[in-house]
């Protein structure tokens, strides 16, 4: 077991919150390093997100009520952080970034099992940083920033080449 702090409607580890599933089509919120020594995973702190209740009809005479965190426009979103888990050391480390990104819609390991790429975005989703984070030194650098007047579309086409370049 990698984490022990998960709690319904408070902390989610390695799975997505409602916003990430709907906005970014992200369900599995972890990635194994190519050498199998590390896992990078998302931690969603939903504790400040307001709850929403919905009636579910499951075949009975009366509905059951499901209560879950559901941020409406302009309200608090989950605070998202990325962690490295080192299997040999049995230790998780928070990946420090220069900015507190509102969204981190994608993570992907490079061919180097110590380097993780991540996309960091602002709330309006019109500014994206492409960041490389080092699992061993817990340092990172922004390789480039993309800005748009309206919206930046997220894709899964990032491919790392053997020489650490990418397309």
Residues of each region from the PLM?
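Beta-propeller and related beta-repeat scaffolds in trafficking/envelope systems
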Residues: 9, 73-75, 145-158, 162
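Beta-propeller blade signature
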Residues: 80-87, 130-138
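Beta-rich catalytic cores
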Residues: 26-28, 78, 103-105, 126, ...
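Surface loop/turn motifs at the tips and blade-to-blade linkers of beta-strand repeat domains
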Residues: 20-22, 96-100, 144-150
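Long hydrophobic segments that form regular secondary structure
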Residues: 86-122, 136
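Predominantly five- to eight-bladed beta-propeller fold
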Residues: 2-30, 41-94
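Blade-terminus and WD-like Trp-Asp/Gly-His loop motifs, strongest in beta-propeller folds
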Residues: 24, 29-38, 106-116, 157-166
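Short glycine/acidic-enriched loop and turn motifs that connect beta-strands
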Residues: 46-49, 122-126
């Amino acid at each position: 077991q990698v984490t022990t702090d998960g709690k319904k409607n408070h902390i989610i580890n390695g799975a997505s919150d409602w916003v990430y599933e709907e906005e970014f089509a992200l369900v599995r919120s972890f990635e194994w390093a190519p050498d199998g020594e590390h896992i990078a995973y998302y931690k969603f702190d939903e504790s400040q997100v307001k709850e929403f209740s919905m009636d579910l009809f499951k075949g009975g005479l009366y509905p059951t009520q499901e209560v879950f965190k559901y941020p409406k426009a302009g309200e608090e979103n989950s605070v998202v952080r990325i962690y490295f888990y080192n299997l040999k050391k049995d230790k998780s480390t928070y990946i420090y970034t220069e900015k507190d990104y509102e969204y981190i819609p994608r993570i992907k390991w490079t061919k180097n099992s110590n380097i993780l790429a991540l996309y960091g975005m602002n709330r309006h989703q019109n500014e994206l940083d492409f960041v490389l984070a080092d699992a061993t030194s817990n340092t990172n650098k922004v390789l480039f920033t993309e800005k748009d007047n309206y919206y930046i579309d997220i894709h899964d086409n990032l491919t790392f080449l053997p020489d650490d370049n990418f397309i």
